[in-house]
């Protein structure tokens, strides 16, 4: 509060983290939450669309669906499980009319192809910690997506990412901490805080 923050969104990445988020949002008026399963957890934490919808409706401070998406960089979850989980999150997001918080790493084509199937649903897309290519950003802009920049954009080897964000419309750019990770230069390597 001392630095001017009015609201904070904490993101669910697993069933366990969602249980913690429910407790946190009840005791702190400025913290809101999301419900979702990170792609790395999608083979372990199997959920259905109704679970997401019911839990979101039962908690007025749950305001988003995710973090969800595809991450083919690591092999923490099977691709088919990630795709199935991502699709369920998208359907819940559309049903609730909540923003969809999307993680995409080494899966630009697959992520876009799936999101594009829902274009007519006017899905609200937030590309979390976006590090994708300019071409990927251009396609996502056609889906009216928002893009969040993390501390990565300040790293000296992020010139291509910096150029991509110059290309994105300013009213579609958000800033995120991805706390406690990805502190910006010159705090790199330290705990990242809002």
Question: Which stretches of residues belong to each language-model region?
Answer:
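Mid-domain alpha/beta scaffold segments of enzyme catalytic cores
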Residues: 1-194
């Amino acid at each position: 509060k001392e630095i001017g923050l009015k609201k904070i969104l904490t993101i669910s990445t697993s069933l366990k983290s969602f249980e913690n988020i429910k407790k946190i949002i009840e005791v702190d008026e400025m913290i809101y939450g999301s419900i979702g399963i990170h792609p790395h957890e999608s083979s372990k934490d199997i959920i259905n669309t109704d679970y997401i919808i019911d839990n979101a409706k039962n908690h007025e401070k749950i305001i988003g669906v995710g973090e969800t998406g595809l991450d083919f960089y690591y092999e923490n979850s099977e691709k088919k499980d990630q795709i199935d989980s991502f699709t369920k999150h998208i359907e819940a997001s559309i049903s609730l009319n909540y923003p969809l918080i999307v993680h995409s790493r080494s899966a630009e084509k697959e992520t876009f192809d799936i999101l594009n199937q829902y274009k007519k649903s006017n899905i609200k897309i937030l590309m979390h910690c976006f590090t994708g290519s300019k071409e990927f950003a251009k396609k996502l802009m056609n889906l009216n997506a928002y893009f969040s920049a993390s501390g990565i954009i300040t790293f000296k080897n992020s010139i291509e990412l910096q150029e991509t964000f110059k290309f994105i419309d300013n009213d579609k750019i958000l800033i995120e901490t991805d706390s406690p990770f990805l502190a910006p230069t010159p705090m790199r390597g330290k705990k990242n805080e809002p």
